[in-house]
């Protein structure tokens, strides 16, 4: 049976380590109802709200999400602007066949022409300079010969407004240029600067703490014993946050499978964070303490287990306006649940308009069989 995979994970972005073996506790009910994927995603998004807005200088707002529209404070361009170095003339003179003009001066960008340019006269003009009233065509300097005070132009089919970027051609005064909910990319920062938006309202940074749980984990620089593995999940997550200027992420450490140690670490993370992400310890093993510890910390569970693979044991809860995610310890599960649950929640808290990840539909390279009813995520190469 062929089926279409509508969600992809980039193999190159995943940590390549062996996942810990999960020993299931028979005392735990394995028949916890699985929430369908779409309902699980919707439950997460219903539970989170955009954070408050702050006003920042434009140069500090790159990458943040706008909370107000950016509108043009004047037409752009604000005047008829020469698009070429050349000679500004009246189109009516060209239409009559006139090609030899008396040049009355030179106008550079950043200056205004104070005199008059009468019929039969022209003005030498630089790129970016304002074209004086009454002149409505510019001929390139390459198509001219200067003869003392006179200039002869060589043009066969002159058009009105040729080589002139007309006033308001890009936008009108008051026109919305950037919508609230858009991220301030470099090009949008340039647009905001062009219309004088020196300070902008953006969602304040989402404060995130990442905690790795598991007695089998050691730091990246450590020499692991044969029964230990290096913590790659937190490195993966922290690297993802480097891509998000609107998120301020910190690492809460690697915590062993000890309820008291976990409670101390997660309580501290909750105090300083808008979102806490903990990896590992959310399944049904005897040492999977995260759900109970989070309950003791006052976190109300809103989602436990979704009908997906990998990532079925995903856990989500809230404490007031704070969001808490418990992600399964398998690295591919971390990547999948981060993309499908954590990232949309982060985007909503940051004030983004579009929060769900994009879907790219491509044909499979080979037939794939699916023997279960779960929404399945598979690693792909990009």
Question: Where are the predicted features?
Answer:
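Generic structural signal for well-ordered, non-membrane alpha-helical segments
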Residues: 33, 37-41, 54, 58, ...
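Structural signal for hydrophobic packing residues in well-ordered secondary-structure cores
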Residues: 45-52, 69, 131, 175, ...
